[in-house]
Amino acid sequence: MKLFMNKNEKYEEPEVHMFFHKQTKEVEQVEKFVRSLSITIPAKYEDEIYKLYPTDIYYIETIDRRTYLYTASRVYESSENLLSIEKLLEAAGFIRVRKNCIINKYKLRSMMISKNSHIEAVLGNDEHIVVTRSYIAGIKEAFAR
């Protein structure tokens, strides 16, 4: 796949054009990812509501029926449930690693086996997320790509 970029002052917002001979999985993935860049999730920090972009979120988890979104520097709370956020962010590269947690695969730095034989996903912010057995195949596949 080739990438051409052209910076031009006449464009007020970025445009993405795709040229392809055949619709492949890779083409579909690029399309879904580009479309996901315009998605925002409203989330609360202290007394303010912010619009978070998927690219800023490292992982999302539910604790005691509350949904938390973790970025590099803050933890936000969302009124949405994890399942609805997961469906919204699937094209943006979010994958489930536990019943109550999804991670941004683009923030996944490495995987390691912990002392008690659990697999941990290590994110770019040095956060270690335990992956439960039923989701190991999915995260291994995401890591291999």
Tell where the protein language model's regions lie, with residue ranges.
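Basic, polyanion-interacting recognition surfaces, primarily
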Residues: 1-145
